[in-house]
Amino acid sequence: MIDLLSEYRMDPTTWLYVASLMTIGIYFRFHRLLSIRNLDLIGLIAFAPGLLLIFHGIEAQGYLWLIAVSLLFLPRLLIDPAFSRRPLTEPNLAPGGMAFMAAALMFFLTANILTDRAVFAGGPAAGGGSDKVAAVRRVPMTRGPGFMPFYRAISLTRDHPGGIPPGETGGEAKDQRSAPSLVLRAGVKAVAIVCQFAIVLGMLFFGLRHFDNIQTGLAAASLYLLLPYTSLMTVRLDHLVPAAFVVWALASYRRPVIAGMSLGAAAGIAFYPFFLVPLWIGFYWRRGAVRFGVGVLTALIVLIIILLCLPSDMRQLQLDLAAMFGKGLFRSEGADGFWEFYPAVLRIPLIATLAVLAGSLALWPAEKNLGNLLSGTAALLLVAQLCLIHQSGLYMAWYAPALILVVFRPALEDRTAVRAVPPRPFGALPRLREP
């Protein structure tokens, strides 16, 4: 099977045109050209040129393009709760055709992951290309803040130039490295596939349980799979793992403990989802805040226990604990991506803006509904990934699923914590009217 897929590769530029035309044909509302839905779709398509510029080595302009499009979406997300009339708008494709397309896209995405050659930091680029372009598709060697053992495990960097320690022949080094490198390569790809399935299934579940319409969830998941970003950044676990946890935190919002554990895991791994915690506490303030806090603390305690169980000295343990809770947030050395070409000092007011935005969304409005939670989560993660010192603007998986769900969501005014969350931790879920 792998041999049959080994030559599978679609040029990114070709896929940009194909995916853009499919997005317009399937989702565009041709009878209302200036609708919010159509503008959202045009905005999602507009990310693709920036990605192509980056993958063709024109990084300064490419990252600037991504940042600009991201900032255009920010006011759209902040004013989304004001759009009270949200009629259900189905895609232009029948449910059976939509399901087939989603399954086909997932199959080819899996094939893309299995045949990806840009897993090791010293490996060749998938489909050729320069080392600079290939590096975009691999985890940066120096990271932080976050769960550093996770980043060390998925970076897969070699300790010596060319991967061959001094004093060893190429054959000896190959014998010593072949088994672990195969295991690590297979492990990264397996986790990437699991994360992509988790994101897609989470969006399907969200549509079924919270929109009461499986076709809407299917349309949202298919649009995520159609994004050129999804096919280009296939094995970046620093993108996918936090994204999968955030999606399932949203999907399980009616169970505060589970939502808290999912969000706590995302925050413990990538740190920046910590900025979501005030918003979620504000959502659960009238019911479920304590349970949500218990879930977040449980996930963080589990990650700390994992740190304690890993073989390391006390100094390394202290550094990893500090990085997990924000040490290195304002670090500017080793910048790559957007902040490699533009003054990194601008990150400081950007991080301050993120903190102010997190506090503001936590306080207003006083009673939040699921629509506020969705749009606020997408907005905060959109700004958070702009603050990254590494490849700022490229971490679209963090916010893209929530953003797409915002695009498709119906009216959700009655989905408040008081109405949707059971009064007891393991109580039956209250019955809600259809949106």
Language-model features and meaning:
Residues M1, P410, D414-P435:
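Short, intrinsically disordered terminal tails adjacent to the first/last structured region
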Residues M1-L250, V257, Y284-M396, A400, ...:
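Primarily membrane-embedded glycan-assembly and transfer machineries that use lipid-linked glycans
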Residues V257-W285, I389-L394:
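Transmembrane helices and adjacent periplasmic/lumenal helix-loop junctions
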Residues G260-L263, M396-P401, D414-V418:
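Composition- and surface-driven signal marking solvent-exposed, interaction-prone regions
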